[in-house]
């Protein structure tokens, strides 16, 4: 093996930045994207805190917790690009903010059907929350049987130099509804699974039965 002198190694190191140099425009976009995603993450934290406070309050007042679990996610970059492309919208940060209401998402899993309407009503009444839209897929299920209560809300997030309203999609459902939705989603990507349609239909039926108790 031929060894290189220290001078040769030093010269090769100096040349590396020139080889992997990233365009300034791309770096600026990456920084802006990172900042916007941070803002959505903070908005999720605000919304989760609101539901956690309500859950604590109701556990004392009613001696039980109506909320079993709170999940959250920020949409992945590839999912954002695919959704904007599908809608025929430009792939820009401005387009994402204007056209997508579900970049930030919070899912609230409740014990019973009545809990969904109770906690959603309490959130809607908070004076710093703006309701953008509501879709009740419990009273009006989707064709595939999907049931859930969807809210697009706008919540203020306080940063060091400003107050920024941010949109968050909130999905509220029971444990049974969440299990069925999760199974249905998995089977969409597992078409070869024997008896897939039967499994979904059975789970959907059981979800309705459980929610009626």
Please describe what each predicted stretch is.
Residues 172-202:
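Flexible glycine-rich active-site/ligand-binding loops centered on an Asp-His dyad
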Residues 203-210:
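Conserved small/polar residues in nucleotide/adenosyl-binding loops
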Residues 104-110, 170:
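Short cationic amphipathic helices and targeting signals
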Residues 1-99:
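Charge-rich, low-complexity segments
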Residues 124-131:
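A common structural junction motif
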Residues 132-171:
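A contiguous pocket-lining binding segment that forms or flanks enzyme active sites
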Residues 112-115:
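Helix N-cap motif at beta-to-alpha junctions
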């Amino acid at each position: 093996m031929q060894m290189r002198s220290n001078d040769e190694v030093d010269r090769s190191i100096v040349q590396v930045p020139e080889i992997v140099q990233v365009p300034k425009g791309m770096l600026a976009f990456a920084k802006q994207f990172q900042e916007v995603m941070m803002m959505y993450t903070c908005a999720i934290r605000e919304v989760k805190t609101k539901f956690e406070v309500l859950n604590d309050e109701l556990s004392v007042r009613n001696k039980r917790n109506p909320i079993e679990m709170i999940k959250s996610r920020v949409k992945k970059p590839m999912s954002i690009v695919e959704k904007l492309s599908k809608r025929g919208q430009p792939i820009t940060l401005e387009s994402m903010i204007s056209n997508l209401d579900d970049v930030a998402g919070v899912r609230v899993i409740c014990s019973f059907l009545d809990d969904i309407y109770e906690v959603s009503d309490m959130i809607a009444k908070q004076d710093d929350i703006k309701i953008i839209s509501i879709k009740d897929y419990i009273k009006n299920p989707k064709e595939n049987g999907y049931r859930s209560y969807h809210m697009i809300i706008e919540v203020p997030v306080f940063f060091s130099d400003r107050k920024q309203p941010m949109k968050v999609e909130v999905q509220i459902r029971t444990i049974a509804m969440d299990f069925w939705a999760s199974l249905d989603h998995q089977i969409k990507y597992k078409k070869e699974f024997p008896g897939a349609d039967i499994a979904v239909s059975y789970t959907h039926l059981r979800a309705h039965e459980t929610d009626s108790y």
